Design a protein with these regions (language model features):
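Short, mixed-charge low-complexity intrinsically disordered segments
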Residues: 31, 37-75
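Short aromatic-glycine-(Arg/Gly/Cys) micro-motifs in beta-strand/loop hairpins
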Residues: 1-20, 48
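A short, exposed loop/beta-hairpin motif centered on an aromatic-Gly-Thr core
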Residues: 16-32
Length: 75
């Protein structure tokens, strides 16, 4: 049975990286978590904040990364 994984990738200004991962039985539940992470990542204070939605077979369904550091240097 296919499982759906949501990986949050938090890159800190110190260079440290955290990757909290959640597993779900349904695609709908996984997509809900994925979009919840993205809504927080959009306003995050981290230099880079990303999320990946994938299956346990390694198929990547969606991914998005917010790079706040780059946006701040363009101003």
């Amino acid at each position: 049975m296919t499982k759906y994984l949501v990986v949050e990738i938090q890159t800190w200004d110190t260079g440290a990286i955290q990757t909290p991962t959640n597993a779900f039985d349904t695609q709908a539940s996984a997509e809900s978590k994925y979009h919840d992470i993205l809504s927080k990542a959009a306003v995050s204070q981290l230099p880079k904040h990303a999320a990946v939605l994938m299956t346990n077979d390694g198929y990547v369904m969606e991914t998005k990364c917010y790079e706040h550091e780059a946006a701040a240097t363009q101003s």
